């Protein structure tokens, strides 16, 4: 059983690094509709990126969080293609 909690993106986290909080997504899924409905499936530790309006985190330590927002675009990838 998984216990989840919802956080607002303005709540502080133990990871306050600007680079970590920038909006990005490595695993973006979109519908084929026009406009597309896209969501990021990335899991981040303890918080979601700074633009996330609806963040869901597990209560584990560290928390595993996913942004539940739906947009009509994908954010740029978090990892560079050269990695």
Curated annotation (Swiss-Prot):
InterPro entries found in the cross-reference section: Bowman-Birk_prot_inh, Prot_inh_BBI
Alphabetical keyword list: Disulfide bond, Protease inhibitor, Serine protease inhibitor
Signal peptide bounds: none
Organism: Glycine max (Soybean)
Site (Reactive bond for trypsin): 32-33, 59-60
One Pfam family, short name: Bowman-Birk_leg
Family: Belongs to the Bowman-Birk serine protease inhibitor family.
Record's protein name: Bowman-Birk type proteinase inhibitor D-II
Disulfides per UniProt: 24-78, 25-40, 28-74, 30-38, 48-55, 52-67, 57-65
């Amino acid at each position: 059983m998984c216990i989840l909690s919802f956080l607002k993106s303005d709540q502080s986290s133990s990871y306050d690094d600007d680079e970590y909080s920038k909006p990005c997504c490595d695993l973006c899924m979109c519908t084929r509709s026009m406009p597309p409905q896209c969501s990021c499936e990335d899991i981040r530790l303890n918080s979601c990126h700074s633009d996330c309006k609806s963040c869901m985190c597990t209560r584990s330590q560290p928390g595993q969080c996913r942004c539940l927002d739906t947009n009509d675009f994908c954010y740029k990838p978090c990892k560079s293609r050269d990695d």
